[in-house]
Amino acid sequence: MIRYPVGFGVPGPACESGKESLLRSSLTTPYNSAHHYYALLTAFFAFLVIIAGALVTSNEAGLAIPDWPTSFHTFRMPHMVGGVLYEYGHRMIAGFTILLTVGIAVVTVAVDKRRWMRKLAFIGFATILIQAILGRVTVMNLLPPAVSTAHAIVGQTFFCIAVAIALLTACRYTGEVQKTAVDRRKPSLIALTLLSVLVLYVQLALGGMFRHGGMSWEAHVFNAIVVAIVLTWTSVRVLSYYSDLDALRRPAIMMLSLLMAQLCLGFISFLTKVVWGQKGAQTQPMMVWSTVAHVATGALLLASAVVLAIQAWRHVPVLQEERVPGTRKAVTA
């Protein structure tokens, strides 16, 4: 039986073949500071799109401009009053982000030697185009809850892709992985991080349906408990066994901190929207800003889980076993 680590890290000399040597070269590229900072700018504007969209929904401004892509059948800027300010602002930020995404795709092809990185940049471009199309469908079909929720999910997916591009273009991530720790535990850390991302996506879908009037709040609140358990489990695993790896410890601490903040914001949002929401207009500003903060923190929480999953894949390969005929003892490669 031969045991060997499998993951995003570079294979060891004992198991490296010519094909794996080619894989090693495909995982590295010269660091380009302009590329990295451009990716950071794109991720920042992707986050602004989420905040602007949350403001549109919270202020019930989704139909303030009833046509798309024009505004009141013209491309001229409308009078920025009432809900038009939120909806038109959201569209302008989203449009600029699309331009940034076109640029990041072109720059990535030009300067990044990693084929998978080029594919990721184009996936990001395709994702934001899908988000724009869903935005049009949402407006033209009078805000159907399922489409509005899909629009929000795709938007946060693009934000996570933009964050991943920004992460993987940083100086320390353009070269080979230097330090790894083989994971022998069940479930593996990679499995836990992927589970964390999954339950957060479920929570995003449930929250979107509740927020857009497609379902009641019970499922969203119940799944919040599931999210808290899974993310705490994942963070504790990292902090207990991999605290010496900054690449894992930092996103784990960030994820745990954001989780606590998100639970608090979720409770405040529940009070303002569900408990106090029918008592009068004086609660509306608090309802709007607590909900927007809840959405924004949720996006950061999902991005932190994605970053942790990437880092686990890079730094903590899973120990797998392969049966070799005629052998009786384990050989560690």
Please describe what each predicted stretch is.
Residues L22-A333:
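Polytopic transmembrane helical bundles with strong interfacial aromatic enrichment
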